[in-house]
Amino acid sequence: MQFSSVFPLEGKACVSPIRRGGEGSASDRLKIGDSSSIKHDRAVRRMCLGYRGTKNGAQCVLTSDAGPDTLHVRTSFRRNFADPNEVAAVILGGGTGTQLFPLTSTRATPAVPIGGCYRLIDIPMSNCFNSGINKIFIMTQFNSASLNRHIHRTYLGGGINFTDGSVEVLAATQMPGEAAGWFQGTADAVRKFIWVLEDYYKHKAIEHILILSGDQLYRMDYMELVQKHVDDNADITLSCAPVGESRASDYGLVKFDSSGRVIQFSEKPKGTDLEAMKVDTSFLNFAIDDPTKFPYIASMGVYVFKRDVLLNLLKSRYAELHDFGSEILPRALHEHNVQAYVFADYWEDIGTIRSFFDANMALCEQPPKFEFYDPKTPFFTSPRYLPPTKSDKCRIKDAIISHGCFLRECTIEHSIVGVRSRLNSACELKNTMMMGADLYETEDEISRLLSEGKVPIGVGENTKINNCIIDMNARVGRNVVITNSEGVQESDRPEEGYYIRSGIVVILKNATIKDGKVI
């Protein structure tokens, strides 16, 4: 997709022809546009990527085209470029994880596996590294053991070069005189460790704080967001995404004026309040096929603050408020320059079992809406040093197969098979997210378990599974049927090793489903 960028010519900047045709870099090729196209492109770029014009002075539209009418110009001014070394990222590790239960019964939300071999925490971490941001704080709270283990294995084991940066894990603690040790909200989580951040600022030239969530799937260059923040001289910048009618009430919704300044923020509105937050999203027609299907602009829970503004809000102005979205931001926009950055690429909030399942299944589509595969902006995860997957007479269609699996005469369709998974003969997996295993069982161990009437890790012979999430280290026996043929929407059967959420069967971590079981 080709974009046009608007650059202002300020002060003594001049337009002088340099050369024509295909010579020079894209940044040197400037094409004079008519006033209508400039106005359109200027508005789009201001709201999406932050390039701003001025009231006075010539306007030029940057394009990647090189044609006979293309005029190359050089200007005598420089933009104030954002420096990733002046940015510190804070990744919120989530609360109790009730929305993703039972996947969060023994782990924090950011530690939930996704895409076969990744964890949710890998998304913001990798986006930070790919954006050049290497000063990162991760705030953990409930069930954080596996999250801490993954962070240390992946990011603190020497595999990634931080140069002068660092990754610090900050676990919820209770200070003397405090009534509660747990984080009471997103803002309270940052406030609890404001002393750590302040101490860090004394030794590092940090000007901007990037607040991130640990339960979303997207690929973003955070420095484009920070650049708009700098260009607008904003106190706070919200990253926003267009959303449809069906899910709009799940998010904080925003309205902004023609300059990109946020003028209204409503947290999870319903009824007439929801209707009042509708906006004209036609300016996104360059990125979305039918913007009318997405009449709302939702806050992604990704924020950039000026350092001093954040400290003042948390320590003084709103010292008693606990949440950014529902409490602080709606008040702050009346007192501060709060800007919107519209992110029109793929973004999925992994807030429920249904959204988690759908996001994983979408990875199997051809072509997928989101790709983990990108050599320029890779996603990092724990190095496991596993051998390639071995398959024997299998039928596999539209599936993702992770490392170190053993597949024998099975059928896999529109499913994700996680690391170290074992599927035996005549078993069928369809529309299923199988997370895999933490360890291998040897052939001798498997034979012994079968001889004792027990179930090995993996999926047994002649088992049929559809519309299911199978958590780590689950043992599914032979001749099992998991299809939820009765269409049950909600059910709690922990004693039998499974739950049903939104019609999706969730097999628990370390659970055993005995031979012949029908779910």
From Swiss-Prot:
Induction: Induced by sucrose, glucose and abscisic acid (ABA). Pathway: Glycan biosynthesis; starch biosynthesis. One of its GO terms (molecular function) is ATP binding. Keywords: Allosteric enzyme, ATP-binding, Chloroplast, Nucleotide-binding, Nucleotidyltransferase, Plastid, Starch biosynthesis, Transferase, Transit peptide. It catalyses: alpha-D-glucose 1-phosphate + ATP + H(+) = ADP-alpha-D-glucose + diphosphate. GO terms for biological process: glycogen biosynthetic process; starch biosynthetic process. SUPFAM superfamilies: Nucleotide-diphospho-sugar transferases (SSF53448), Trimeric LpxA-like enzymes (SSF51161). It comes from the Eukaryota. Expressed in stems. NCBIfam families: glgC (TIGR02091), PRK02862.1 (NF002772). Belongs to the bacterial/plant glucose-1-phosphate adenylyltransferase family. PANTHER family: GLUCOSE-1-PHOSPHATE ADENYLYLTRANSFERASE LARGE SUBUNIT 1, CHLOROPLASTIC-RELATED, GLUCOSE-1-PHOSPHATE ADENYLYLTRANSFERASE-RELATED. Involved in synthesis of starch. Catalyzes the synthesis of ADP-glucose, a molecule that serves as an activated glycosyl donor for alpha-1,4-glucan synthesis. Essential for starch synthesis in leaf chloroplasts. This is Glucose-1-phosphate adenylyltransferase large subunit 3, chloroplastic/amyloplastic. It comes from Oryza sativa subsp. japonica (Rice).
